[in-house]
């Protein structure tokens, strides 16, 4: 029950991060075609776009994916990637998705993430899903 749904742009930073996690995952298509349908609980991993503000911070394919009510009903948490050069807007896509979907903002990491980030996310996801499955 530890599904990751993620979006990665042509830079492939988020894709490489998710691959290093070694967890079951589904990728939101880059073209935003909306072809991905999820039928089980998931945590979304997304990059943050834009030059430091909240406008345009969530990638459009992620917005389209979450605008599908069925997909949105299965989101359980969010992890965001970003660039710390953007200061207070670092990983702001996570804040936006967390607030709009009313799910916890679980973690944030810079660019490709570090080995420490990978370990933190793996351990955190295990604890998170264990808590989710308790009665």
Curated annotation (Swiss-Prot):
It comes from the Bacteria. Probably involved in ribonucleotide reductase function. It comes from Brucella anthropi (strain ATCC 49188 / DSM 6882 / CCUG 24695 / JCM 21032 / LMG 3331 / NBRC 15819 / NCTC 12168 / Alc 37). Pfam families: Flavodoxin_NdrI (PF07972). Belongs to the NrdI family. GO terms for biological process: protein modification process. Signal peptide: none annotated. This is Protein NrdI. GO terms for molecular function: FMN binding.
